[in-house]
Amino acid sequence: MGHEYYQLKQNFLGAQKTGFPFGGLFELSAAATLSAASSQTDKYSIESYLSRINYNFGEKYYVSGSFRTDGSSRFYRDSRWGQFWSLGASWRVSQENFMQSVNWINNLTLKASFGSQGNDNIGSFYAYQSLYTLLANGSFNGAGINSLENKDLKWEKNENLNIGIEARLFDRLSLTAEFFNKHTKDLLLNMPKATSTGFDSYPANVGSMRNIGVDITASVEIFKGSAFEWTLTAMASHIRNKILKLADKPEIISGSNIFREGEAVNSFYLPVSAGVDPLTGNQLYWVDRDKNNKIVPRYKTDDVTLTTNSREVVGNRIPDLYGSLTNDFRYKGFDLSILTTYSIGGEMLDGVYGSMMNVGYKGYVWHKNALRRWQKPGDITDVPKIMWDQQIRVTDQDLINASYFAIKNITLGYSLSKKWLQKIKMENIRVYATADNIALFTHLKGMDPQYNFTGTVGYTYAPTKTFSLGIDIKF
């Protein structure tokens, strides 16, 4: 049994004044004119009551169960509390009598669990309330509503089914495999709204989606001697996502992304490029609607206005396979660890590259690939001609393979031998050097595909390389 209470309170106060009598003064009271003043207070709290029970029978059969109820200040009082539970069981097959003669299996465990979890992260502390902003207009002050309330907002609930196996073979190879099926109900998202209402969206529970996948971990002790050890650990995950149901309408379009029933979350929704017209140098698009928005057989056009209603789902960020490889080496007092990560499949939309290829505007930094632009009739290229104030749509051609391989961490350490530790009466002394974010191999140039869920890359920095030295001392 347990109880938790968490509260966050943020206070902000800012002011600006001008007209100091002379330099070197830092107190606002010394200035003559108040230029700006603002303040803000945010509060968020969550309270939880929880319980858990575990049962072990004969070191073979294990059963566990949990129940909790959580209350969040982000929801209206009628739907503030959510109830969540889980049940799990495991069977150590290797402990059964019929397995005692199988010497090469050190451990074999089957396990399964089912349960639910809650999520209240809607991106706002006051999602169920209608907020207003105080504004100045001329010489008068007033208040304007800047968000819509939704008192029906409630917890997002995740129901998880996990089935797995753990094994230790030949006292050298460890294997773990787990299948998971995660069903998310009452998704918390901002629902788009007609801008004629004065608001572009409002927070809502918009539907449900499912994630199905497999996680596999294998660790093998390649060399296992008294002086030298080498252990290789490989992790691989595969996941498939599908939106099952959306409230009110079958799709939600947000910029270059779409939430559509039957598709993966944050799928790319873009016009399809038909290349560059070799006669005119204009960007061509595949469309299936005419100027009256009627469906017609697919054809090519350079009329960018027709692409709005002819966009297609052309991919998503979710990789086919992702994971890591870790090599651990030990030789006498030295230890070396090398961590690498990888991702195979999925696409990303590189907005930075796209802006540098939009060669129709002056004053922009152009990418070197703009040199491939169309220049005269008959040129075959994928970059349209330079034309002042031309409108070019982002298309599937701007998607980039998001696969990557990264050397994330290398750590080299040395631990003093027990002989020396006994002399100085210390338990352990280890010195080490660490390097993080060493190298990244990817189709993206300068940006990092590892830390983005939507698949859209903006003006963000890639993780910096970090080098550090340290010492661990235990008395």
Residue ranges of predicted features:
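Outer-membrane beta-barrel and related beta-rich outer-membrane complex signature
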Residues: Y5-P21, F75-S79, S101-N103, S116-S130, ...
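Surface-exposed extracellular loop regions of Gram-negative outer-membrane beta-barrel proteins
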Residues: M1, Y44-Y76, R80-Q95, N158-E159, ...
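Surface-exposed loop/turn segments flanking beta-strands in extracellular/periplasmic regions
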Residues: K9-S39, S124-E149, T195-Y202, I253-A264, ...
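Outer-membrane beta-barrel signature, preferentially recognizing the C-terminal barrel domain
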Residues: T33-L50, L135-L175, Y202-G225, G262-S267, ...
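C-terminal beta-signal and terminal closure region of outer-membrane beta-barrel proteins
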Residues: L34, A127, V206-N211, S256-N282, ...
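Short loop/turn motifs that connect adjacent beta-strands in outer-membrane beta-barrel proteins
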Residues: K60, S94-L108, R172, F223-W230, ...
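Conserved small-residue
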Residues: A204, F223-R317
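Extracytoplasmic gating/loop element in the C-terminal half of outer-membrane beta-barrel translocons
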Residues: S72, S343-V431, A435
